[in-house]
A protein has these predicted regions:
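Peripheral, non-catalytic segments flanking oxidoreductase cores
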Residues: 1-182
Length: 182
């Protein structure tokens, strides 16, 4: 195996974010994508306390009794956002396949803003843009997860600017494409 494929390149985003080396960072990302197709990022500006708070409160939520967690299950099986108990969901179901469920319990959330009005004319979009079910009673899962989600949104926007710079197009080229993501 070629030596260059034995490790993934780690790229520091900090010089892009602070403006000291935007072209150099973009070039590193382009090279990683061309040569390997994957990369690791650091210097992404997501605070460790934001990650730790979300992890801690998530563990607290998943340790709750099943009856309390079930209060945050979506009202219809086809909706994703909210809590899903162990072995109640599976990727195969979305593909129309009959197979055993995934052996996991999950909590799923989407964008904080309500984008549904932009997609009312698409019946399938109602499921993707259903409101978040954010626990705040037994455990305030909402606040730390919203903080983390917003950090991920900011990181996504930064990465798309890096990609745009690497492709030699305007830094905002991809921005409008993620305004109403789900």
């Amino acid at each position: 195996m070629d030596e260059k494929y034995k490790t993934l390149p780690t790229i520091d985003l900090k010089p892009f974010i602070d403006g000291t080396a935007t072209v150099a960072v973009a070039d590193q990302v382009v090279e990683a994508c061309k040569e390997i197709g994957f990369l690791i990022i650091k210097g992404h500006q997501i605070k460790q306390t934001t990650i730790d708070n979300a992890f801690h409160i998530s563990k607290t939520f998943f340790d709750l009794p099943q009856t309390l967690k079930n209060k945050y299950h979506p009202r219809e099986p086809s909706l994703q956002r909210g809590y899903h108990a162990f072995a109640t969901r599976g990727l195969a179901y979305t593909l129309g396949e009959n197979s055993p469920p995934d052996l996991r319990e999950t909590y799923f959330m989407g964008p904080i803003e309500d984008h549904s009005k932009y997609f009312n004319h698409l019946s399938a979009a109602a499921k993707a843009y259903a409101p978040n079910i954010l626990p705040r009673d037994e455990v305030d899962l909402a606040t730390p997860l919203i903080d983390l989600y917003r950090s991920f949104e900011d990181l996504s926007a930064t990465l798309l600017k890096v990609f745009a710079r690497g492709l030699k197009v305007n830094d905002e080229y991809f921005s409008k494409l993620i305004e109403r993501h789900f």
